[in-house]
């Protein structure tokens, strides 16, 4: 009881909800067993099934296992993160919608009520960012002067600094779509350059391989020609030897005939 009365220490993030204690290995195994039992077919064998949160909630789960069922994914509205409500809309709300004074001019906005309100964008955001940065330096010097003369009058200057910082951050957030688009263009250009370099390297390798094959082909023709020449010479020599043998045989026959006479 004494510990319950103690104030909770301030932290950057809120503590997890108490339901995390139900995420034990035993409870997870029990939930898997229930899912297998519920997914059995007519043959009594469990079937593979992708369970949705609604189907899991329809099962007869004990109270300690109901916390293991994930909630439905929010499709519209807001959701809570560490006790703070976050909007599902990706549209950046304008400073006027947030009740904050806007220190730079706005572009004309669309008046169509069917379309979601789009944030107003300055004509030259870089110029106004530089202007707000200089105003921040000036207001900070004034803030230091107030603290040195009348510290109790610091609140108004703190509000001015806060408003300047919010306007600067809003301008930066308005520039993020352009930054993302430019970053995507750079990434695509780098990928295109890499593809071109790879194609050039493949063309170079293709030319080298073709040259090597042509060289082998030329060497093969030379070898065939040399082999054919050697075969011709050998054939001629064989023919000459045969003719000489025939001549010797004929001469021997005539010599024998002459001796017989």
Curated annotation (Swiss-Prot):
Where it mainly occurs, coarsely classed, is nucleus
Q: Which residues does the annotated region (Disordered) include?
A: 31-54
Give the InterPro entries listed for this entry: Med7/Med21-like, Mediatior_Med7, Mediatior_Med7_sf
GO biological-process terms attached to the record:
regulation of transcription by RNA polymerase II
Transmembrane intervals: none
Which UniProt keyword terms apply here? Activator, Nucleus, Transcription, Transcription regulation
The record's listing under Pfam families reads: Med7 (PF05983)
Q: Where is the composition biased (Basic and acidic residues)?
A: 31-45
Give this protein's Gene Ontology molecular function annotations.
transcription coregulator activity
Localization of this protein: Nucleus
List the GO terms this entry assigns under cellular component, sorted alphabetically: core mediator complex; mediator complex
| PANTHER family according to UniProt | MEDIATOR OF RNA POLYMERASE II TRANSCRIPTION SUBUNIT 7
Question: Tell me, how does this one assemble?
Answer: Component of the Mediator complex.
This chain's function reads: Component of the Mediator complex, a coactivator involved in the regulated transcription of nearly all RNA polymerase II-dependent genes. Mediator functions as a bridge to convey information from gene-specific regulatory proteins to the basal RNA polymerase II transcription machinery. Mediator is recruited to promoters by direct interactions with regulatory proteins and serves as a scaffold for the assembly of a functional preinitiation complex with RNA polymerase II and the general transcription factors.
Q: Which family does it belong to?
A: Belongs to the Mediator complex subunit 7 family.
Q: Under what name is this protein listed? A: Mediator of RNA polymerase II transcription subunit 7
Q: What is the primary gene name for this protein?
A: med7
């Amino acid at each position: 009881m004494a510990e319950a009365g103690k104030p909770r220490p301030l932290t950057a993030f809120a503590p997890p909800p108490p339901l995390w204690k139900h995420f034990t290995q035993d409870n997870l195994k029990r939930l898997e067993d229930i899912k297998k039992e519920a997914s059995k077919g007519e043959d009594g064998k469990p079937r593979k099934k992708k369970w949705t949160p609604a189907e899991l909630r329809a099962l007869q789960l004990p109270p300690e296992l109901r916390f293991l069922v994930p909630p439905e994914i929010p499709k519209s509205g807001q959701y809570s993160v560490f006790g703070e409500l976050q909007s599902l809309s990706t549209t950046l709300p304008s400073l006027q919608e947030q009740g904050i004074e806007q220190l730079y001019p706005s572009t004309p906005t669309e008046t169509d009520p069917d379309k979601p309100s789009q944030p107003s964008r300055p004509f030259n955001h870089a110029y106004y960012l530089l202007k707000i940065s200089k105003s921040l330096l000036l207001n900070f010097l004034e803030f230091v002067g107030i603290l040195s003369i009348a510290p109790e009058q610091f609140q108004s200057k703190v509000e001015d600094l806060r408003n300047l910082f919010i306007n600067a951050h809003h301008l930066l957030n308005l520039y993020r779509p352009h930054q993302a688009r430019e970053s995507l263009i750079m990434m695509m250009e780098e990928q295109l350059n890499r593809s071109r370099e790879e194609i050039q390297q493949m063309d170079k390798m293709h030319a080298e391989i073709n040259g090597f094959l042509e060289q082998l082909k030329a060497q093969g023709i030379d070898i065939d020609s040399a082999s054919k020449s050697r075969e011709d010479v050998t054939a001629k020599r064989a023919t000459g030897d045969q003719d000489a043998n025939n001549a010797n045989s004929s001469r021997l026959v005539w010599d024998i005939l002459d001796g017989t006479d």
